[in-house]
């Protein structure tokens, strides 16, 4: 259903309706700044927190989408210091790459890393090394750390010039270096207290969390959703326009948040990462509004419950899928990864992909296996629906 923007959105520039994959409405900040301004850009839209704690161990993660395919050099969207003499910023290097630019050094997030679709960036520092991650993949390791902080700003660089034209969401600042597995595990879901470093206490490692939800934006204040109250003041606000924007994040049922992965526009036609045996691929790059997020119930072995006629056994592992828009994908399930078993693999047609809408009730068959490679079964051309999936077999020896 449509929502009234005047009823739902506070009246300042840059708050955009972001349809979440669960059909709720959250928001994303659009720093739609003038990409031609190179000096005296003090009228640009930005958010700021006063900060007085230097950190040599930290993690900064952020979902970002560029408003242009090749922003000019120094067009920034995050920084931690009030001049270029110290601290660092996340910006464009002017050659199509997101960059970590610091007083002690700089590093890139990979060639062609700037796109006009959503990408996840993360920076970690452990006191001696700085690492960069792009969509969960380690892309840079350097033997230096920038440890000087006197502010946290979003929407511009340290010099307050060359503001950026970027959408940003899910900004998280920690005073510890998270592992790659932690970054990957949480990039497609909002934070909750099941995170090892977060219990909603001021003693937690999480120091700033800008979720961009309806409850976190009010007037010219962007509220910190950590326990610390590090709210950002928003400056140079203007008129609001209604534009939809989509970040591949979902709130899956808590019992199905093991190994949460996604397939979205930045995945192009590459396989998604595997959620304990299940991967997805698409034949053509998804548009921004179309994506799927999926996790599983962390259960191995097999089951004979809730089966439709014509099947004898299914995986006890159940994958929950949440999706936005329309996604048609090949779903590939690795039997040994899914069940922990090493069965006699049958013909592709012996396998069925089952689906149900809720957490209980009988499954229905939605696809028959199209090919087998080792113990990987491919179900091709699946119209992905929200709900719960398992792999089943017509012969109990095949799982």
Regions found by a protein language model. Give the residues of each.
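Extracellular glycan-recognition modules
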Residues: 37, 41-99, 129-130, 162, ...
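Short hydrophobic/aromatic patches on beta-strands that form ligand-binding or substrate-lining surfaces
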Residues: 58-68, 121-123, 154, 168-174, ...
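Extracytoplasmic low-complexity segments
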Residues: 1-43, 187-320, 327-343, 347-350, ...
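Short, aromatic/His-centered strand-loop micro-motif at the edge of beta-sheets
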Residues: 98-120
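Extracellular glycan-interaction patches encoded by glycine-rich segments
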Residues: 36, 103-109, 148-169, 173, ...
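Localized edge beta-strand/strand-to-loop motifs within extracellular or lumenal beta-rich domains
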Residues: 117-131, 175
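Extracellular/lumenal carbohydrate-interaction signature centered on repeated Trp-anchored short motifs
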Residues: 49-60, 111-119, 146-148, 160-167, ...
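Short, solvent-exposed beta-strand-to-loop segments that form ligand-recognition rims
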Residues: 134-152, 197
């Amino acid at each position: 259903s449509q929502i009234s923007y005047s009823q739902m959105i506070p009246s300042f520039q840059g708050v955009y309706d972001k349809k979440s994959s669960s059909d709720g409405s959250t928001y994303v900040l659009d720093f739609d700044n003038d990409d031609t301004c190179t000096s005296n850009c003090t009228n640009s839209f930005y958010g700021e927190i006063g900060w007085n704690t230097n950190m040599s161990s930290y993690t900064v993660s952020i979902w970002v989408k560029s408003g242009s395919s090749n922003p000019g050099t120094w067009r920034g969207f995050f920084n931690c210091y009030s001049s270029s003499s110290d601290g660092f910023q996340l910006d464009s290097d002017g050659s199509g790459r997101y960059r970590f630019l610091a007083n002690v050094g700089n590093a890139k997030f990979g060639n062609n890393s700037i796109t006009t679709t959503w990408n996840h960036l993360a920076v970690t520092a452990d006191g001696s090394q700085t690492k960069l991650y792009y969509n969960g993949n380690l892309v840079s390791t350097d033997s230096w750390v920038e440890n000087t902080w006197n502010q946290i700003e979003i929407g511009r660089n340290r010099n307050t010039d060359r503001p950026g034209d970027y959408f940003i969401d899910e900004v998280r600042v920690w005073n510890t270096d998270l592992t790659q597995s932690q970054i990957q595990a949480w990039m497609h879901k909002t934070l909750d207290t099941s995170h090892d470093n977060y219990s909603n206490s001021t003693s937690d490692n999480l120091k700033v969390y800008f979720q961009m939800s309806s409850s976190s934006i009010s007037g010219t204040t962007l509220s910190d959703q950590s326990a610390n109250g590090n709210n950002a003041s928003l400056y140079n606000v203007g008129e609001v326009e209604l534009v939809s924007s989509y970040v591949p994040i979902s709130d899956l049922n808590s019992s199905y948040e093991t190994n949460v992965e996604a397939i979205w526009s930045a995945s192009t036609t590459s396989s998604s990462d595997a959620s304990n045996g299940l991967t997805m691929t698409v034949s053509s790059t998804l548009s921004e509004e179309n994506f799927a997020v999926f996790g599983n119930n962390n259960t191995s072995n097999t089951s004979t419950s809730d089966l439709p006629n014509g099947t004898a056994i299914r995986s006890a592992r159940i994958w929950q899928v949440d999706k936005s828009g329309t996604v048609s994908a090949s779903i590939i399930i690795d039997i040994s990864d899914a069940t922990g078993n090493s069965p006699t693999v049958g013909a592709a047609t012996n396998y069925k992909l089952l689906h149900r809408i809720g957490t209980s009730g009988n499954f229905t068959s939605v696809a028959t296996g199209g090919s087998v490679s080792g113990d990987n079964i491919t179900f091709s051309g699946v119209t992905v629906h929200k709900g719960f999936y398992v792999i089943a077999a017509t012969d109990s020896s095949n799982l």
